Amino acid sequence: MPHTFIDLFAGCGGLSLGIEQAGFTAVFFNEIMPVYASTYLKNREIPQGHYFIGDINDLNKQLDNYRSIWETIDGGIDLVCGGPPCQGFSMANRQRVIDDPRNNLYKAYLFFLRAVRPKFFIMENVKGMAQRIDEIKDNFREYMGDDYAFGYRILRAQDFGVPQNRERLIFIGNRLGIEPNDIFARIEAKKRLGFVLRDALEGLPQLEARPEKNKSELEDIRYGLTERDFDYPRTAFYQFINGDRVITKLYNHKNRYNNPRDLEIFRRLPQGGNSLHESISDIMPYGRRNSIFKDKYFKLREDEICKTITSHMKFDCNMYIHPWEARGLSPREAARIQTFPDDYVIYGAQNSWYAQVGNAVPVKLAEAIGASIMEFLA
């Protein structure tokens, strides 16, 4: 019998994919954004009706319509995972987080956990959530009682091979009597030597910046294609994200429009250079402003890990300038930095590709967490 899991706030599927690579099988997911759900569905087999596209609060009102999915599984659901958006946990003021209306989604996640009662759960979030740990413990006990033991750690994606500076707060709980510290010890044991940005970018076709606005839907090999045949170099990083599979298509490797001034900035900046660098002082549009604009432009260093991939890339990639080409990173390059395999296709408009990838959990971080939990179920 396969080990089963449910993903809430599933996004385009980064957390799910890592859990699947650890050996679990998805039986249900929830995502509010239809285009994210489309990407999730088109990259895996999910039975019709085994998902809810909409607000989790609406799902919780209709749980009786879905209970048969998990109640007919021998032994019940093994794992529920998810990352509820909780902007309130990043607030600088001292207002109690439990009173912040933006945290209703967090409570909805706990409501679902109480209804399904999985053997394990994973909740990932911004590391600022750790500052409110006392309230969080109270909320867990309010919803879950004393049946679940849970703990938390701030994990760095780079420690698990991800070529990116990304820290996430990971909560793990279980009702099997397992000490949470033992689970995190298994996760820590999976740390490995990592990769740098060059490893994720090398071997992909060169692109030019698109010179025309509002033409991202056009297909032109100079600026990149939604899909093309491609013979990937079999590098160590290729093996890391793809395993032994032979992939012959390149997806989502398209560049976006940049104005002539930005392109000149991209060309002049050295690797590691930002908005305050002297090489662009005569054309820098924020030159008269203070240092808060220093990262408006940033050329990435190929010999270091990448800065955190975020959904801001849907607006521009000026903070993610390619280290040796005068352009921003492509969505496929961002996906590689998030350790998505090369045949994981992102659907929707190009700006949405960036947002979906930027909001995802790094796949190989998720796999390390999932594999550690699997060791207690095997």
Regions found by a protein language model. Name each.
Residues 43, 186-190, 323-327:
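Short Gly/aromatic-enriched secondary-structure transition segments
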Residues 31, 124, 333:
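Acidic-residue sensor for enzyme active/binding pockets
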Residues 227-378:
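C-terminal target-recognition/interaction regions appended to catalytic cores
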Residues 65-74, 87, 91-285:
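Class I S-adenosyl-L-methionine
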Residues 2-117, 127-131, 138-140:
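Core alpha/beta nucleotide-donor-binding catalytic domains of modification enzymes
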